[in-house]
Amino acid sequence: MSRIGRLPIEIPKGVEVKVSPDNVVTVKGTKCTLEKKFPPIVNIEVKDNQVIVTRNGDDKEERAMHGTTRAIIANMVKGVTQGFEKTLEIVGIGYRAAKQGKKLVLNVGYSHPVEIEEEPGIEIVVEGNNKIIVRGADKEKVGQVAANIRRVREPDAYQGKGIRYAGEVVRLKEGKTGKK
């Protein structure tokens, strides 16, 4: 048995979990409702205020999906109650971020400002002009939006300028040594 997969998921108060016969899990909470379809090689059932994930066989794919399914459902339950957030920092002279309506506008050294649309279910907040916070209930979506923002201008290896996750350590390379 998978060490992660065999652990039951406690359902907190105010959260409702439903499993349809075709393995679609719907988690309804105080913030929103999340829905995801899982492959039929795992069995998902709700018993005694807990979600229990089991698998049919013991081949490699079923073992892998057992723990993965349990982790995704646990993240769905956490997402509808607390939510998830990723923080990004902008480092560089003249680099800044601003919010215009539902758009995030990044000035990060290009000849034009880069605009990123806010996705449904995701909230983008700009603190100051060099800190971006991405919030939402779906952990996968929050991470993907944050990665898309970071990809606009990844930290460069020589000066460290660019967009990075909060707490991310960028290893800087040493520049060329001049002629003597």
Swiss-Prot record:
GO CC annotation terms, alphabetical: cytosolic large ribosomal subunit
Disulfide bonds: none
Record GO terms (molecular function): rRNA binding; structural constituent of ribosome
Pfam families named in the record: Ribosomal_L6 (PF00347)
Domain of life assignment: Bacteria
Stretches assigned to coiled coil: none
NCBIfam families xref list: L6_bact (TIGR03654)
UniProt-listed PANTHER family: 60S/50S RIBOSOMAL PROTEIN L6/L9 (PTHR11655), LARGE RIBOSOMAL SUBUNIT PROTEIN UL6M (PTHR11655:SF14)
Protein name: Large ribosomal subunit protein uL6
The species this protein was found in: Thermoanaerobacter pseudethanolicus (strain ATCC 33223 / 39E)
Annotated gene: rplF
